[in-house]
């Protein structure tokens, strides 16, 4: 029996895969629990159309991410932090402060969850943050930490 998976199933396949399973497993478990549907010709056509639309959407999202990455290439950020007389920051600079600096620079729609700082920022100096805009598109943004 061939079925189309509606969600990921461990040791069987991923969402939208067409897999062959034993009749009992398909009829008694996968279909009643909503994890799969029977792979009829009409269901295969609907799946093909959905995959085509999803691929188009994903291409648009990737294109938007590449456009944003090109805009972010020339951006240099300055982040102010309270420091001691030796240049050590009270606390540390995190992705939240980088997101706020990006918002001030005109990039309000960048979420802090996509910003990764490789090293701990606890002193005044120059650092780099990596923005993972898409699974295939990331950009490195330099930022300077200065004393307030």
From Swiss-Prot:
Pfam families documented for this protein: Ribosomal_L9_C, Ribosomal_L9_N
Cross-referenced Gene3D superfamilies: Ribosomal protein L9, C-terminal domain, Ribosomal protein L9, N-terminal domain
Iron found in the keyword field: no
Gene Ontology MF terms: rRNA binding; structural constituent of ribosome
InterPro entries (alphabetical): Ribosomal_bL9, Ribosomal_bL9/RNase_H1_N, Ribosomal_bL9_bac/chp, Ribosomal_bL9_C, Ribosomal_bL9_C_sf, Ribosomal_bL9_N, Ribosomal_bL9_N_sf
Record's GO cellular component terms: ribonucleoprotein complex; ribosome
GO process annotations (BP): translation
Protein's job: Binds to the 23S rRNA.
HAMAP family, sorted: Ribosomal_bL9 (MF_00503)
Family membership: Belongs to the bacterial ribosomal protein bL9 family.
Name of the protein this chain belongs to: Large ribosomal subunit protein bL9
Organism, as annotated: Parabacteroides distasonis (strain ATCC 8503 / DSM 20701 / CIP 104284 / JCM 5825 / NCTC 11152)
Top-level taxonomy: Bacteria, Pseudomonadati, Bacteroidota, Bacteroidia, Bacteroidales
């Amino acid at each position: 029996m061939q079925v189309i998976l509606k969600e990921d199933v461990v040791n069987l396949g991923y969402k939208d895969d067409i897999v062959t399973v034993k009749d009992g497993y398909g009829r008694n478990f996968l279909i009643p629990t909503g994890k799969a549907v029977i792979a009829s010709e009409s269901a295969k056509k609907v799946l093909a159309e959905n995959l085509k639309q999803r691929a188009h959407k994903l291409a648009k999202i990737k294109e938007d991410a590449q456009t944003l990455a090109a805009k972010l290439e020339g951006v240099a950020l300055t982040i102010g932090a309270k420091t001691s007389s030796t240049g050590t920051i009270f606390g540390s600079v995190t992705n939240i402060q980088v997101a706020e600096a990006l918002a001030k620079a005109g990039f309000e729609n960048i979420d802090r969850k996509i910003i990764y700082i490789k090293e701990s920022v606890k002193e005044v100096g120059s650092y780099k943050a990596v923005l993972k805009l898409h699974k295939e598109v990331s950009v490195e943004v330099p930022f300077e930490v200065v004393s307030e």
